[in-house]
Amino acid sequence: MLSDDELTGLDEFALLAENAEQAGVNGPLPEVERVQAGAISALRWGGSAPRVIFLHGGGQNAHTWDTVIVGLGEPALAVDLPGHGHSAWREDGNYSPQLNSETLAPVLRELAPGAEFVVGMSLGGLTAIRLAAMAPDLVGELVLVDVTPSALQRHAELTAEQRGTVALMHGEREFPSFQAMLDLTIAAAPHRDVKSLRRGVFHNSRRLDNGNWVWRYDAIRTFGDFAGLWDDVDALSAPITLVRGGSSGFVTDQDTAELHRRATHFRGVHIVEKSGHSVQSDQPRALIEIVRGVLDTR
């Protein structure tokens, strides 16, 4: 096990072999580089123009998609949302889908102007809905991972245990060691592989000068009303595929039916068994196959 000092100096791409193993991929690892566009940081995968854009959930970062992207084998852009990962924080702590999409639109035009698909999970999915409504040229097709515009209502209905790692966003922010952060995360997601959780915490944390560790993401201090995004769904021209975690309560059958009713081009829903909210972390191989199936229909 690496010490805190060794973790501090570890390159962010040093663990990609673990992602390849998790994805069941043999052979050389794909090209990947960190790119910056103003206040937004992202990971650009592959040696050609990105075909897929990935937007993560609240309290996550672009590396949450590493295993899926390695397994998919397509050129991609995984974005750190505002206030997350290596992207800049907002002074007002407002990371609503509406503001996120306004920030991301020019970035995506610069870094992935010809992308065909957007895969968005949780807050990233809601951001993608708003983005598709305001800039339809940027979202040719949309895959939503365990989210609809009823997300805040569902979040309020769940217990802390049911929220899993999402509950960590509202807890302690500073820890005396990396292991203390990892222990808390393991307790929140006991069903998940410890090696995967350790990798996730590594990407989602940073060490302070005093030796303590903190989460990389800002505290979301202002919550907007997501329900208005249902009107955006009404206006979307992009086809939509919904992926649900079979053990997650963040999307209900009622929400699925509402999405089906409102979306002009609803391709269908995939329920991933033995998965909670973060399907890309709980069952990455299943998500790889679903996304590949969507790509193959183009």
UniProtKB/Swiss-Prot annotation:
It is an enzyme of class 3 (hydrolase). Changing residue 122 to A: 550-fold decrease in catalytic activity. Its EC number is 3.1.1.1. GO terms for molecular function: carboxylesterase activity; hydrolase activity. Optimum pH is 8.0 for the hydrolysis of p-nitrophenyl hexanoate. It catalyses: a carboxylic ester + H2O = an alcohol + a carboxylate + H(+); a butanoate ester + H2O = an aliphatic alcohol + butanoate + H(+); an acetyl ester + H2O = an aliphatic alcohol + acetate + H(+); a hexanoate ester + H2O = an aliphatic alcohol + hexanoate + H(+). This is Esterase Rv0045c.
